Amino acid sequence: MNSTDLLDLEKHTPMMRQYLTMKAAHPDMLLFYRMGDFYELFYDDAKRASEMLSISLTARGKSGGDPIPMAGIPYHAVEGYLAKLVQLGQSVAICEQIGDPATAKGPVERKVVRVVTPGTLTDEALLQERQDNLLAAVYQGKVGYGFATLDVASGRFVIAELPSREALEAELQRTSPAELLYSEDFGDMGLINHIRGKRRRPEWEFDYDTCIKMLLEQFGTRDLRGFGIADARLSLQAAGCLMQYVKDTQRTALPHINSIVRFNQGDSIILDAATRRNLELTVSLSGSRENTLASVLDNTVTAMGSRMLQRWIHQPLRCHDTIRGRQQAVQELLETGLYEDLRAELKALGDIERILARLALRSARPRDFARLRDALGILPLIRERLQRCDARHLKSLNILLGDFPEEYELLCRAIVDNPPVLIRDGGVIREGYDSELDEWRKLSDGGIDYLEQMELREKERTGIATLKVGFNRVHGYYIEVSRAQSALVPIAYQRRQTLKNTERYITPELKEYEEKVLSSQGKALALEKQLWEELFDLILPKLQELQDFALAASELDVLANFADRADLFNYHCPELSDTTGILIEAGRHPVVERVSQSPFIPNPVELSNHRRMLIVTGPNMGGKSTYMRQVALITLMAHIGSFVPAERALIGPVDRIFTRIGASDDLASGRSTFMVEMTETANILHNATANSLVLMDEIGRGTSTYDGMSLAWSAAEYLAQKLGAMTLFATHYFELTQLPEMLPGVHNVHLDAIEHDDTIAFMHAVQEGAASKSYGLQVAALAGVPANVIKAAKHKLLQLESRDHGVDMSKQQALPLTMTPEPSAAELRLEAIDPNDLSPRQALELLFELKRLL
């Protein structure tokens, strides 16, 4: 249906006019329109939903002369369909019936009561438990970008001023927003096209003055200087648009969003998008969450702890004091064994971070309050354990945990032990919490005694032995008599329902009692809902302190998890130095050692002011890439406060980690593998410093031999001489092994292999010096390349090596490289013989025969 039809409402039925008016207010969303027990979708919404949800597309009569495409879903199954839609990046407006159909003249009154978008989820059923769900906004300035993210499910609000396209790309990969807001004139769509939940917003929503006003209203302040963000103009424009969007979609106060933090790149080790991808921090190269650094490190016992750990992994710190604080906490938890008891207690806390967000939005359910109550009950035990700790950071966290005896006592009095899922039907408020509620409940529940007495009385009065007094939700209270005795009922009995073998009646007395009970039930439920709403008002004043409790508990979970990993995997505490360099003894790759079927071979690395670059050579499949990645991962782990898989690690200042490892075509941008490789290389050469860790793997593979070797040589020379970056430079160009003779601070190391006949055994051990050969043909044979191809390759290798050494191969040199020489008669004869079948005499005769064939 086009926009002209939407505006011409008079030709539609009253119900469709109501629908189209609401749809016009939410043009970019699917509108779930409540009709009885179903949510219906019409026109284009129905077609889209039918395709995305695999539901039937039908038609509902005509309106305006045309059939109306329609699709519907049952209201009781809506959460499952919503989850699928938000995963696809769709937003949904939910329109409910708020009027009474019995009294309505025309269409029942309806209202959009809830808006669900991928980036503003707070409902437990729709969220990924162990992943942040971020709403982001980006604003492009003349120079640089403003970027803001908000986790509505926790209240965490962060902004960043990003100087370049590369910095924005890295932030998008780090945060992986579920929904991204961008302005109408955003000029770099190639950066954001891959994000499913993109939302284009009008330019006025990014107006600076409008945005500042929006933020000041939210935080209740006169200016933003107290947050240290007053000069972050571009990111404040992004933040203001984001805040406007959240208010529009949530349609309620947002008290849990009470601060905003500026992310400064200088506070953490900078990881560009390629590095995050190549190191497989939280997502593997295949897109899985298995076999990643996070999958090995994460044994946290709470979902909020898991989310914090992933944020730490993507944001390794540079401040040594903060890192040492974490290390000392982990060390004490490990040495005392306290981490085991602490983890058992933390596990009982649940996901209070998200519970508090739902509390702030007043969308919390009864079981959320019960979980919060249980968490507050565990808190004194956790604090008591931490009282015995000496580590300064553990003491600070213990203070941040806080005390909430009054809130705990309130929730214990107010909420039943095992409340129902919803407040809708009551049964949530505990008996004894409110005397008036108890009285109404007693009246509505105490009818059991009354009905039993009435049943006995009526049996005596009528002499009907089969008489029963009962109740059902459809017909209310009734007196039931078997059909055989129905002739005995008094004249005052009024027939209410006829069944196969019984008759049901109502009497004036029973009718009066029914009205009284139903009235008391309604009043009890109304009062219970009122008391429920008051609970929010009683808890919310402590929201900030409760959020601090959740934050401290999350960090305790991560630190106890680090102690658990160190104990289980034999990790050691790394030392931090103010002198540039990385020294690792017996280092191991944290992921490969966990998934490998064979024992992992530990390896050392030494980078210092006098040993800035290692040229890494060795056989393909020998472990060069694994070795380089393990150095980067150990360095990163040390900077998040974790212990590391090494006997010893001494690590100096690191400002960035770069990786140029592997590449594939970027088809979306029309870039070849070689172009991707060179773009990543250019980024490293422009941005690396003397404190950067650089991993360069096989530069120059995507072009001709001499072009590739020249580029690799020049890049290595630039890194070593101009930048002085700490570099591991793996290459298959053996000419580069001459660099140590020409440049100070450059050294050769290699991964060894042992060759036996036509087979090869990889030793995976790093040794000083250059490798002697690459063993490419042996690796090809292991990969299953046909034997005749390997044989031809060996011949061609000899031919090329002889040519390089100036050997006159005359006829053979005339052969094109794509040709394989025919085997000689002697070779053919030898291939046809099994030596085990020859007698001594036959063997002697064969020798003479072969001599003649040469």
From Swiss-Prot:
What CDD domains does the record tag this protein with? ABC_MutS1
GO biological process assignments: mismatch repair
Task: Please list the GO terms describing molecular function.
Answer: ATP binding; ATP-dependent DNA damage sensor activity; damaged DNA binding; mismatched DNA binding
Task: Quote any Pfam family the record assigns.
Answer: MutS_IV
- Write down the Gene3D superfamilies for this protein, in alphabetical order: 1.10.1420.10, 6.10.140.430, DNA repair protein MutS, domain I, MutS, connector domain, P-loop containing nucleotide triphosphate hydrolases
Quote the record's binding site residues for ATP.
Answer: G618, P619, N620, M621, G622, G623, K624, S625
Q: Name one GO cellular component term.
A: cytosol
UniProt lists the family membership as follows:
Belongs to the DNA mismatch repair MutS family.
User: Which SUPFAM superfamilies does the record match to this protein?
Assistant: DNA repair protein MutS, domain I, DNA repair protein MutS, domain II, DNA repair protein MutS, domain III, P-loop containing nucleoside triphosphate hydrolases
Keywords, alphabetical: ATP-binding, DNA damage, DNA repair, DNA-binding, Nucleotide-binding
- Report what the protein is called: DNA mismatch repair protein MutS
Taxonomy, superkingdom: Bacteria
Q: What does this protein do?
A: This protein is involved in the repair of mismatches in DNA. It is possible that it carries out the mismatch recognition step. This protein has a weak ATPase activity.
